[in-house]
């Protein structure tokens, strides 16, 4: 299994230099005859993505790192040293530290986001926008014992039961101290939320790095929705000039009304305004990084075109959504998937996802029910938007709940007649609905 190491019992330096887990992986990757026992566990997401789509975060990271000859040489030097000594030691400024320790505070309600990553998602779920069928199998994400089984509503008082794995305040301070101890070896720090730019606590780390004269050597990366740039008295633009480089990796997988629907509470004009403001600084890059889901894939080519047409965006990248399974690209109706294939002729990984068969048990009617529940929740607010207005091509596949039993029974009879038996033995899936 995976190791029992966490921030409570293992420092960053111990994890990188002395950790048996990391050293096992290093040894396997340098052994051509290895069975890759540990690597298969640690890298299972990338292995799965490469098998399904021919592309993963691993392949993207290798491409980015190898394009920087100085950084790539550092990596090669460390590999050679480990081969000679069997030990990894921090000697060069080449480490990336990823910090997901500042909580789940977020200002958006993105339909595909796991609830443990967003305080707004938790609030909206607690007020009734929830689906056991879509999210119920992800036990770390469920508000345990809080859903009223008759109404399907999560009780507000129990919102704290959402499991998010964040560490407490004392450990946040400890993480700052640990980060400062290895600061001379840090090439980049990636801050992950929630929405990091509105998390006040992370600015304490930035202040410490500036005061220690380390900031000028370090790249700061944000996985951000880029809708807000201030948190209380903190303004990210006051900190930017002190760092070697600041990379704003904006979560953008739709343009205009599309992203405003999928990532509810987004203001597209504000995202662009903040992007333009970021580019006033010579040491800021803005990248778009999208999550390709069954909704976004219907318009994601617009994001690609936008980036190609607008030089304020440095690069675009994307990942294919894996969970919740119902939201995967391959679970769209076949008619829509076939129609989208020509739009992604230059993007074989997205085409590969579109060509995959539907996952067993994935039912687009459950997706419709969940999304329409969200539409109802936002009716009358400034974030009001409706699924079939934004994605009208989906409406023909929607079956009203009161009509589904008749459709289900009809399909069972057709199947029974086809195989020459008197009683249907095949149950309807979402294929029956599309």
Model regions and ranges:
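Low-complexity, serine/threonine/proline-enriched polar segments
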Residues: 133-177, 329-370
